[in-house]
C-alpha cells in the first residue's frame, strides 16, 4: 500500500501483483542546480519512475548504490542521462536500458557497507555538453575536514515529501571520521571505506542514494541509502569512499569489456 504521508511511491504492476518503488533519499535545504551544469548526473529509474541517483563514470557505465536494487523487483531498470527536468522535453535527454547490474559482492540489505552498484548501459552514451563522465578519486587520501563538497539529486526536498522536477544541489562540509564516529553521532560504525558530511538541516538522504559527493571536481564518495534521520546534525550524511574500491570498479568494467 502506497505511503500517503508525503513520501513518493511509484506503483509497479507486475502481472496481478503490485510492488512499490520509493525514491531513496532527498536533498534538504538545497536549491535548484544550473541547467546541465552537472552533465554526469543520472536518474536511475524503475518503470519510468526515479528511484535513485547515479553518475556516469565512462561512456557505458553508471555508478550508483547497491541498495537501489531493492526497489527493482521485476520492474524495468533504466538510466536517464542528459536531464535537468525529469518531465519536460530536453534535446539532451535519453533513457537507456541496463545491460548488466553489478552490486558490490559484499553489499548486504541490512548494512551500508560496500554500498556500490555498477550499471552497464545497453549501449555507449551519446556524449555532449549535457552528458559527460565524471572523474572519480583513485588515490587513497582523506578529504580534509571542512572541505565544501557538492551533492545533487532529484529526491524529495522537504519532510512533507515535496518532490522537485528539476535537479537540486547543495554544498556540504566534510566531517572528519573521528567526530563522525563519536557515540553521539554514528557510534563507531564509520569505517575507512566511508566518509561523512555535516547534516544540520542541509543534507542528502536515502532518496538521493547513488549520487556523487563531488569535491574539487572529483567524485570522492557515493550517497549511501542507509536509514537515518535526514537533516539531523547528530546523524551526519554517510558516503561510500570511492578510493577504497578502485580495484573492484576497474575489475568489473574490464571483465565486461573482455567478455
Curated annotation (Swiss-Prot):
Region (Self-inhibitor loop): 224-228
An individual GO BP term: response to bacterium
Domain of life: Eukaryota
CDD domains: Tryp_SPc (cd00190)
Gene Ontology terms, MF aspect: serine-type endopeptidase activity
Substrates-to-products reaction catalysed: Selective cleavage of Arg-|-Lys bond in complement factor B when in complex with complement subcomponent C3b or with cobra venom factor
EC number: 3.4.21.46
Regulation of protein activity: Circulates in plasma in a mature but self-inhibited form. Activated by factor B (CFB), which displaces the self-inhibition loop. Associates with CFB complexed with complement C3b.
Sites annotated Cleavage: 26-27
Location of this chain's protein in the cell: Secreted
Signal peptide from the UniProt entry: 1-21
Class of the enzyme per the UniProt entry, highest EC level: hydrolase
Classification via PROSITE patterns: TRYPSIN_DOM (PS50240), TRYPSIN_HIS (PS00134), TRYPSIN_SER (PS00135)
Segments crossing the lipid bilayer: none
InterPro entries: Peptidase_S1_PA, Peptidase_S1_PA_chymotrypsin, Peptidase_S1A, Trypsin_dom, TRYPSIN_HIS, TRYPSIN_SER
Active site residues per record: 67 (charge relay system), 115 (charge relay system), 209 (charge relay system)
Disulfide cysteine pairs (residue numbers): 52-68, 149-215, 180-196, 205-230
Propeptide: 22-26
PTM (free text): CFD is activated by the removal of 5 residues at the N-terminus, named activation peptide, by the MASP-3 isoform of MASP1.
Keywords from the named record: Complement alternate pathway, Disulfide bond, Hydrolase, Immunity, Innate immunity, Protease, Secreted, Serine protease, Signal, Zymogen
PANTHER family per record: COMPLEMENT FACTOR D (PTHR24271:SF54), KALLIKREIN-RELATED (PTHR24271)
Protein family per UniProt: Belongs to the peptidase S1 family.
The record's note on its domains: The self-inhibition loop inihibits the serine protease activity in absence of factor B (CFB) substrate.
Protein function: Serine protease that initiates the alternative pathway of the complement system, a cascade of proteins that leads to phagocytosis and breakdown of pathogens and signaling that strengthens the adaptive immune system. In contrast to other complement pathways (classical, lectin and GZMK) that are directly activated by pathogens or antigen-antibody complexes, the alternative complement pathway is initiated by the spontaneous hydrolysis of complement C3.
UniProt-recorded name of the protein: Complement factor D
Gene: CFD
